[in-house]
Amino acid sequence: MRKIVIGTRRSKLALTQTNWVIDQLKQLGVPYEFEVKEIVTKGDRILDVTLSKVGGKGLFVKEIEAALRSGEIDVAVHSMKDVPSELLEEFTLAAITEREDPRDVLVSENGHTLDELPAGAIVGTSSLRRSAQILHRRPDVQVKWIRGNVETRLRKLKEEDFSAIVLAAAGLKRLGYGEDVITEYLDKDVCLPAIGQGALGLECRVDDVETTELLAKLHHEETGKAVLAERAFLKEMNGGCQVPIGGYATVLEDGAVFLTGLVGSPDGKTILKEGKCGMVADELGKEVSSLLTAQGAGAILEKVRSELEGS
């Protein structure tokens, strides 16, 4: 029986997601053994600065792809929001799993919703996308950077001077946290999610046909189509997890895709948002990018990048 080695990050969330993938494959009765290999990525190692300042794309992916390239692992399990918009030609995303809740949530110390937080409250996030939208909604609060895995951030909320933190609903739900922890689900009109948020990506070598066919059994067509549109938008904007870009797509009953894209200034003073419907997912991503670029989105992102390079 062939053994398939699956690589992932070392966090409890990453391991939970990977074990979920293995469970799904086992339920299909596939004739393989599975082994999990934990890999530490650059994004996991550097925790004393914000993600935007760590710089580069694929902060949580490159080391896992290196293990894939060398044959040390056969499959990489990623959170789709961590996957760069362009894959190297030697790799393929054989499956994108059905999306968990794509929204962000607010977890607050005193049970305050975003609108109820007192002026001057400190909100923790590691994302420029989240900070831009939080400050746009509540310019009277402060955003303070917070890094670490889910458990670390929840502990910091209790032990440090944060009034609230913003996390992905999907991660909390996969770890078993529920309404006793989540104060408020942030509507997508308030905080548009990251590209691919809530979906998992299963990556393998493009020449490994057997593994590609195996993983394809877990591909969710509707999620895949939506995420394709989002990633086309991200690619066209030349974005990554270190710039303030959001995007969320849904597939309508007739098969068309509705995509909303967002670019914001980190201080929240400018939020550009456009929505458009189309039948061809990747073309739609380009069209939404063009609409935002015409409003000045490119200039906002260029300013962010130059400030990051200078810091």
Swiss-Prot record:
InterPro entries with a match to the protein in the record: HemC, Porphobilin_deaminase_cofac_BS, Porphobilin_deaminase_N, Porphobilinogen_deaminase_C, Porphobilinogen_deaminase_C_sf
EC number: 2.5.1.61
GO CC terms: cytoplasm
GO molecular function, one term: hydroxymethylbilane synthase activity
Family stated for the protein in its record: Belongs to the HMBS family.
This protein's encoding gene: hemC
Source organism, top-level taxon: Bacteria
Modified residues (S-(dipyrrolylmethanemethyl)cysteine): 241
Subunit relationships: Monomer.
HAMAP family, per database record: Porphobil_deam (MF_00260)
Pfam families on file: Porphobil_deam (PF01379), Porphobil_deamC (PF03900)
Its job: Tetrapolymerization of the monopyrrole PBG into the hydroxymethylbilane pre-uroporphyrinogen in several discrete steps.
Protein name: Porphobilinogen deaminase
Cofactor, free-text remark: Binds 1 dipyrromethane group covalently.
Cofactor: dipyrromethane
Misc: The porphobilinogen subunits are added to the dipyrromethane group.
Known catalytic reactions: 4 porphobilinogen + H2O = hydroxymethylbilane + 4 NH4(+)
GO BP of this protein: protoporphyrinogen IX biosynthetic process
Source organism per UniProt: Shouchella clausii (strain KSM-K16) (Alkalihalobacillus clausii)
Sorted UniProt keywords: Porphyrin biosynthesis, Transferase
Pathway participation: Porphyrin-containing compound metabolism; protoporphyrin-IX biosynthesis; coproporphyrinogen-III from 5-aminolevulinate: step 2/4
